[in-house]
């Protein structure tokens, strides 16, 4: 149930009845403070201005038409014309009861869309590093949320599997296989790439061979395609191990690398020329965009084909957007790519729109994110200044969590300890990132992320187990509890219930904006409200069975909401800690 949407509809109808235009915005928001009720309608200011009347006067007229019987216990005008809405306890009780009857906790399904989500995108023949973490886990949280809401989501892992470097890599792979007799595991991808590059720079005969191999690969030679495929397979097999460790839903089937679009590129260049969008300039094919200016203030030239006939990332991205609309039938496309690529994407999409490849009705959205920084405020590096491998980071997370869990549970069996350490360690790394607004840089800090207090994964996982422990102590049959009524008479019960019922609103924001930190903040708030409720409203020692069972149902909805919310973030929950 989306209470915000219900109230928006009711307030909008009342505003129209009071003389507001049919497209008026009621601007119903969750109230920031308890004294302002559960929701506040702020739309009177803008509409009153259009009608040439005082906002408070409009608010008074709206109130005469606003029927919230059975929903609100009190509606009042505050300040210059805000309408504060206090929800009726009986309404809250009824909605809690309804939410508990469905696995989806009463979350309604929006109109189903096909949504393509572009995320992770590591490079072939290189190990994933910390720079891939944000795109991978933020993108996956968006995917999980959209799928939970009922959308058809297509994961697109736009891996870097094409380019001139593959001549060098194939030549080096060939040399290694000749010297090491048969196949090699390529265990050290980073070392493999580094050695290939060193030979390319120092050995002219090797470099010449590499350049010839690029031409053969690009012309579709079977042997070179096989060698290229081997490099892709080895890399993606290693990456899959990382995805599985991260509890990320990407699989090999989601790989849609740069190479996928190669056959489209000549046709796109020819089409852009035919449409008069692309012109020859100094031997290259260029699209000049009035929307972007160069240093001289002239339209910026975006190269789509080089003098030597080679294509650029922009050309691939144009083809990619076209493919996602025409072949995948996307209604919406989300790109989880760091903020430094913003201008590049905007240029590619401007060309896409001008060429008519994707209509304006299909949003292309750059959900950009900032950088992961060390405690010194500089990009996160190893002690020697190198790039941190993602596998090494996860190993350290597991080791630190293992120590932490063993300290708190010295008698825990080894297999249980390992399972718990994995949930806490990986959860801590992911949640520390997901709980920050993705558009900003954030400081990576082991101590903060593994703390059992504050907005952290260990705190949220512990909060969940704490609610479950109430049920273990209550020793009650869930079926027997199902028929018990929900009674809301205390303020803390009402506050917890109202917040729990905002789960759908939170999911809707995450789905619309691609901002998992909103879900983290919501769940942290729920955990805090439950804590206050637990302290001030005795559950197991309640004055009678009716109150006890009602409070157990609030605890039950809290547990289900925390579990489901954390699941949309890809954070594992545990039964005991």
UniProtKB/Swiss-Prot annotation:
SS bond partners: none
GO molecular function annotation: arginine-tRNA ligase activity; ATP binding
Cellular compartment(s): Cytoplasm
UniProt-listed SMART domains: Arg_tRNA_synt_N, DALR_1
Residue numbers covered by motif 'HIGH' region: 122-132
Keyword annotations from UniProtKB, A to Z: Aminoacyl-tRNA synthetase, ATP-binding, Cytoplasm, Ligase, Nucleotide-binding, Protein biosynthesis
EC supergroup of this enzyme: ligase
Main location: cytoplasm
Keyword Protease: no
Catalytic activity: tRNA(Arg) + L-arginine + ATP = L-arginyl-tRNA(Arg) + AMP + diphosphate
Gene Ontology BP, a term: arginyl-tRNA aminoacylation
Pfam families in alphabetical order: Arg_tRNA_synt_N, DALR_1, tRNA-synt_1d
Domain of life: Bacteria
GO cellular component, as recorded: cytoplasm
Enzyme Commission number(s): 6.1.1.19
Key word NAD present: no
PROSITE patterns: AA_TRNA_LIGASE_I
First and last residue of the signal peptide: none
Family according to the record: Belongs to the class-I aminoacyl-tRNA synthetase family.
Subunit structure of this chain's protein: Monomer.
Name listed for the protein in its UniProt record: Arginine--tRNA ligase
Originating organism: Salmonella paratyphi A (strain AKU_12601)
């Amino acid at each position: 149930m989306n209470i915000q949407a219900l109230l928006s509809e009711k307030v909008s109808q009342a505003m129209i009845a009071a003389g507001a235009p049919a497209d008026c915005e009621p601007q119903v928001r969750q109230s920031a403070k308890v004294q302002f009720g559960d929701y506040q309608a702020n739309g009177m200011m803008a509409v009153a201005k259009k009608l040439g009347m005082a906002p408070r006067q409009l608010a008074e007229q709206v109130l005469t038409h606003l029927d919230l019987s059975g929903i609100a216990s009190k509606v009042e005008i505050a300040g210059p014309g805000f309408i504060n809405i206090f929800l009726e306890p009986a309404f809250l009780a009824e909605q809690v009861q309804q939410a508990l009857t469905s696995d989806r906790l009463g979350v309604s399904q929006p109109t189903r869309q096909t949504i393509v989500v572009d995320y992770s995108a590591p490079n072939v023949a290189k190990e994933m590093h910390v720079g891939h973490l944000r795109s991978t886990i933020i993108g996956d949280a968006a995917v999980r949320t959209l799928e939970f809401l009922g959308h058809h989501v297509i994961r697109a892992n736009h891996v870097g599997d094409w380019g001139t470097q593959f001549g060098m890599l194939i030549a080096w792979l060939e040399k290694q296989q000749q010297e090491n007799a048969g196949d090699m595991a390529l265990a050290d991808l980073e070392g493999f790439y580094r050695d290939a590059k060193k030979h390319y720079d120092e050995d002219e005969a090797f470099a010449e061979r590499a350049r010839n191999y690029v031409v053969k690969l690009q012309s579709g030679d079977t042997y070179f395609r096989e060698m290229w495929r081997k490099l892709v397979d080895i890399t993606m097999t290693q990456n899959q191990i990382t995805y599985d460790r991260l509890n990320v839903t990407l699989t090999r089937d989601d790989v849609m690398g740069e190479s996928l679009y190669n056959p489209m590129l000549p046709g796109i260049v020819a089409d852009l020329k035919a449409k008069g969008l692309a012109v020859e300039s100094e031997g290259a094919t260029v699209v000049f965009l009035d929307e972007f200016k160069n240093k001289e203030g002239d339209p910026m030239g975006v190269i789509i084909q080089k003098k030597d006939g080679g294509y650029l990332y922009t050309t691939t991205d144009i083809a990619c957007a076209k493919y996602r609309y025409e072949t995948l039938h996307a209604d919406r496309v989300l790109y989880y790519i760091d903020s430094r690529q913003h201008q590049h994407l905007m240029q590619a999409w401007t060309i896409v729109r001008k060429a008519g490849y994707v209509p304006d009705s299909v949003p292309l959205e750059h959900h950009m994110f900032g950088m992961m920084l060390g405690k010194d405020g500089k990009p996160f590096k190893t002690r020697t200044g190198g790039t941190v491998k993602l596998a090494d980071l996860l190993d350290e997370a597991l080791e630190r969590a293992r120590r932490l869990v063993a300290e708190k549970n010295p008698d825990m069996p080894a297999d249980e300890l390992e399972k718990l350490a994995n949930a806490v360690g990986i959860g801590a790394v992911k949640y520390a990132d997901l709980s920050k607004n993705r558009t900003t840089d954030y400081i990576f800090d082991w101590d903060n992320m593994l703390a059992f207090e504050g907005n952290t994964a260990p705190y949220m996982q512990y909060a969940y187990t704490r609610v479950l422990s109430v049920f273990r102590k209550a020793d009650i049959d869930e079926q027997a509890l199902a028929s018990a009524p929900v009674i809301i008479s205390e303020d803390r019960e009402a506050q917890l219930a109202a917040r729990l019922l905002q789960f759908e609103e939170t999911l809707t924001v995450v789905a619309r904006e691609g901002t998992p930190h909103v879900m983290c903040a919501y769940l942290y708030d729920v955990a805090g409200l439950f804590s206050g409720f637990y302290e001030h409203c005795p559950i197991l020692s309640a004055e009678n069975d009716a109150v006890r069972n009602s409070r157990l149902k609030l605890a039950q909805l809290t547990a289900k909401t925390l579990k489901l919310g954390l699941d949309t973030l890809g954070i594992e929950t545990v039964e005991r800690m």
